A protein has these predicted regions:
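Divalent-cation
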Residues: 1-14, 19-121, 125, 131-134
Length: 135
């Protein structure tokens, strides 16, 4: 949990973008992306100024995961980018490298956010909590 929160802080240092991680045991939808979209709204991640929030969603017992990017960042990166990040995370999970897989994904998303939504200096504020959310 602490390593993941630290990765979020590091990833957000050079971007105005926001990253959150939500972990639960079971996904109550057939598709993990549907649950990620629901949680994105419930966590008010759609209320960032630049619509550049990203949610990593994991349902551990169901072995499902998804990444949901808000409109601003999704328009820049597209579905293929999110799929690539999920594939990379799954590769780490297949090696039982769960925390490293999540942290690497967070840092990669941070780089993409930095490219499209650079840090605004002192004007930039942390709009969303960096703590991992457990459902």
């Amino acid at each position: 949990k602490e390593a993941i929160a630290a990765a979020i802080i590091q990833a957000e240092k050079k971007t105005s973008g926001e990253i959150r991680v939500f972990i639960e045991n079971k996904c109550r939808f057939i598709e993990a992306t549907d649950r990620a979209a629901e949680l994105f709204q419930q966590l008010n991640m759609h209320q960032t100024a630049e619509r550049n929030g990203v949610l990593l969603y994991l349902a551990i017992a169901d072995r499902q995961l998804a990444i949901w990017g808000d409109q601003g960042i999704h328009e820049k990166l597209g579905s293929i980018y999110w799929s690539q990040q999920v594939t990379a995370m799954l590769a780490a999970f297949n090696r039982a490298d769960y925390t490293a897989g999540i942290c690497t994904c967070i840092l990669e998303i941070g780089k993409a956010l930095q490219q499209h939504f650079p840090f605004h200096g002192e004007k930039d504020q942390n709009e969303l909590d960096n703590e991992v959310v457990f459902g």
